[in-house]
Amino acid sequence: MQIRIAENGSQPPHLTRAPYHTALKWVPKDADMRQIDTPMPVFMTQNAFIRMCAHAGSDLDNEVGGWMAGKYCRDSLHGTPFVIIDTVLPAVYTKHGAAHLTFTGDTQVALHNHLEENYPQKDLLGWYHTHPRMGVFFSQWDTWLHQNFFPEPWQVALVIEPHQSIGGLFIRQPDGSLDQRRYFGFYELTNRNQGGIVFWHNLQPASIRNEQSQEVINS
């Protein structure tokens, strides 16, 4: 049973301002990784980050994963696309092992129903999964799954390696290409009264240029 799970791509993006002013930018520590700018800004709430890390640590021997949802947006000032990940849906009924994760037909039905019933106004932004003891990269199977089930240019993937506490995002280039070895950081949406909580050892905070942005989430 196969279900195409990227069904909301025809929906127009939310027109709003990107929330740079409440975000902490995280970039790879590897200088070579930083040579290419992020193709599309990805903002992530602290709650979403914590939930994915908790799921990643729930099974250190086998791959686990799920969906990421939130809002697909277009900056009302600059016209550039960006996404805000604020909802995490851990996958159920998967087939998994130390080096593989399969979203079965039952997985896709359960996740899709959960998204529609509980978060009808949210967009399916992509998926996340772990690579226990293997590092942060995209395998051939990961690439096939991403291209076939998350084909929209604004849909992204997150890979977490829980043993080393490292992770990174895989984001398509404007021409649609996807480098299986090059990952990107993200913008952590922070609480005004506290700092960042990202603890991955392969990312570091970056100073952010004045990006002249205002409010976003409540649009």
Segments and roles (model prediction):
Residues 1-124, 133-219:
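Conserved beta-strand-loop surface patch within small alpha/beta domains used
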